[in-house]
Amino acid sequence: IDLDVAVFVLNEGEQTAFKVIKRKSDDSSTTLHIDLNEKFTSFADLHRDLDFWHEPTNGIVYLCSHQGNPSKRFKSIEMPIRRHGFYANDDVIIDNFCIKYVGSHGIGSGTTQSLVVRNCELGWIGGSIQFYGDRQPTRYGNGIEIYGGCGRYVIDHCYVYQCYDAGITHQISAVGNEDVLMQDVTYSNNLIEDCVYAIEYFVGKAENGANRRMQNVLFTGNILRRAGYGFGNQRPDKMTPALIKSWGHYNRASNFRIVGNVFDRSKPHSLHISADNPEWLPKLQNNTHILLKGTDALLGSPEKTYTVDENYGNLIRRLFDEEGGRYIFVEEDDVP
């Protein structure tokens, strides 16, 4: 297989195989299994059940199966490879599609005007290698992404699940000199679950005074569930999941509202919402927060880490002016 295999999805998601990638040891004398932290140089070092290795030099895929022939062990085996489901341009409506088993982005795009995605199902997205760094490769894959500027970007009534990175996102990193405007962004009435980040957004501060900002952004009526519970937990950086993820970026914004959503459990962070200026933070209203005891949140300007406890509601009201919020605290085993 020439294109990188992202993951094995077995029996339509009952199980997944773990994609082994190699990282350099601290002294660079050998390479290690990214998860087990033991010496790994080739397929011959596979020994854990349902670990697999895709050999980049010849394209051969090796799967370790302790229970015999995988074709007899499993009723179905899907192997997403490194490609997008769709790559969108300006003035596109994607309506009533099922997009599954895609190794890169389900729907990807650069700077785009008028992209509407509605009534779609996207699942088992991402996990292939994006690039090879100095010490280890980086995997990637979002359900729906615009990287760059946008106008009239609408995602409505979609079911998005099991994405290696974010379910839905608009983003631009902190490089370059160009102005970037993200405006009229609406994520509404979606169910997003078992992704590392249900919704991810960030706007990096550009060089040489370029103008980068978001305006007229609305997240409403969404059910966001179980960030950090899906196959994206294969990632080595396991301490990043959150239901809404802004990272610690510049994130200049105006008229940014998060209204009437359900936030249902996430670990280790419930939310990660921050900006360089407190006036750029979104306003929250009438959201329901189902919170795992013992987790935390990264919030505010400047960003700080807060414990999820009985004071969480007061904290959200103070930082984001939330009115009408509901806060429900559960143990991890309380809710299936």
Which residues does each PLM region occupy?
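Residue-identity detector for threonine
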Residues: 16, 30-31, 41, 57, ...
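Feature targets compositionally biased, intrinsically disordered low-complexity regions
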Residues: 12, 58, 67, 84, ...
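Extracellular beta-strand/beta-solenoid scaffold signature
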Residues: 2-5, 49, 78-85, 101-108, ...
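Right-handed parallel beta-helix
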Residues: 90-101, 113-133, 140-143, 150-171, ...
